Amino acid sequence: MLNAELDALIKKPIYSISRSALKEYEEEYFAKKCKKSKEQIEEAKTIIPGGVQHNLAFNYPFPIVMVKAKGNRLYDVDGNEYYDFLQAGGPTIIGSNDDVVRDKVIELLEDCGPSTGLFHPYEYKLAKKISECVPSVEMFRMLGSGTEACMCAVRVARLATGHKNVIKMGGAYHGWSDQLAWGMRVPGTLNLQSHGVPLFVFKHTQEFFPNDLKSLERKLI
């Protein structure tokens, strides 16, 4: 049922939003219903670049300040309710602020606080569970972010193979490390969105086009 609905959605034509409609939406919604968000973001900009700590929070005409989350709903500082299609970029797949997860996190915090920097039994339990659910993951190591994971993967691969070149999917986001900031968002854009990264850094980085095996094969030959 769900797959059929998604297929039907994908087959629908792409419509663009007219400038007049967008302007009306800004005035009718953001200007009238998101006043506190705008005020707080303007204040945050005085000390935080862009007013937010993560790019996912950027929004036009200004970021929305969220103060509550539960299940598939988000609530902003002005009291507006939203359906959460972002899911924190992917990790909150069971919804936000799940009761079971929250209670377990609180229990752990009461026992040893937010961090000790040392090993905890749950680290092994998580690694084992992931390996059981995804058999191809024979070994599992957690890192602080996707950027660090990609940096580590590149280094390990180079060490294991003795090769230098890296091939990434064009248009895909592989973190903010210098060597992978190539062809981001749109395939074939090369270093268009790599401001501040010297060109020589990409000497061993290439990209292939998504869903194009021939493009990948040409890079591998």
Where are these predicted regions, by residue range?
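Active-site-adjacent loop/helix segments that line or gate small-molecule/cofactor pockets in enzymes
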Residues: 19-68
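PLP-dependent aspartate aminotransferase-fold enzymes
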Residues: 100, 128-221
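Glycine-rich loop-to-alpha-helix module at the N-terminal edge of alpha/beta enzyme cores
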Residues: 2-11, 81-163
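Short, hydrophobic/aliphatic alpha-helical segments
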Residues: 35-44, 73-80, 131-132
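Non-catalytic, mobile gating and regulatory segments of ester bond hydrolases
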Residues: 1-31
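Hydrophobic alpha-helical scaffolding
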Residues: 30, 34, 116, 206-209
